[in-house]
Amino acid sequence: EGVALVHNLICGALTCVGGGTGPRYTPYHMPHRTEVMGFMTVLHGDDRFYNNIFVQKWPSDDIITMHDSDDGFDTENRAAGTWMFDEYPTYDEWISQFDFSKPADMAKLYGAHEGKLPVWIEGNAYLGGAKPSKKDVNALISDVAREDVRVELVQKEDGYYLDTNVYELIEGFKNRMIDSDVLGKAFEPEERFENPDGTAIRFDSDYFGTHRGVDVIPGPFAGAEEAAKVLY
């Protein structure tokens, strides 16, 4: 809840989304500090996914873990992408539940108050079978098979490199520049996504500090040339 993922290369799956918390109270903090500002139940949602590349690098079958104490089992998702947010509302869907022209009917709004918060999903690329959310705006969904998508971390004498063809697979796809104004405010603290010094974030530079230019592509690098450089 209150997460912003922007310009990442994600080869794994998002697990335990929407579960594992129950209606417990969880602390949130003062902006850029560690003091507790208040407590709030975890509703899930209020998440933002912009300009990421999702890759189904490994098989998508769920992981099954048997219980030690009984005959039950737990399942853990291994399907990459944002598909698990299909049933989460967009902001317009969520805000439409509230009528600000008259006093609130708390009994009528019980479901809205306990329901999931909205999500913002835009400009992501899905490769090798990674599945998009139906809420994704301007998504690239590739039909290239998992085995034909290459993402490997390679060690050489002078450091680590990324051996990948993802920038060939997303060639020609672009989205808008993301900044603090696009991300808005997290729901519960009502604070903007910003730099530690309180200034606005503008995602106009890539992993190496290279300017993204007017054609903004998803992922951590401004282009294929940058992706071929030594990482560290």
Positions of the model-derived regions?
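Glycine- and acidic/polar-rich repeat regions and solenoidal domains
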Residues: 1-176
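Short, surface-exposed, low-complexity cationic segments
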Residues: 214-232
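C-terminal accessory segments
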Residues: 41, 149-220
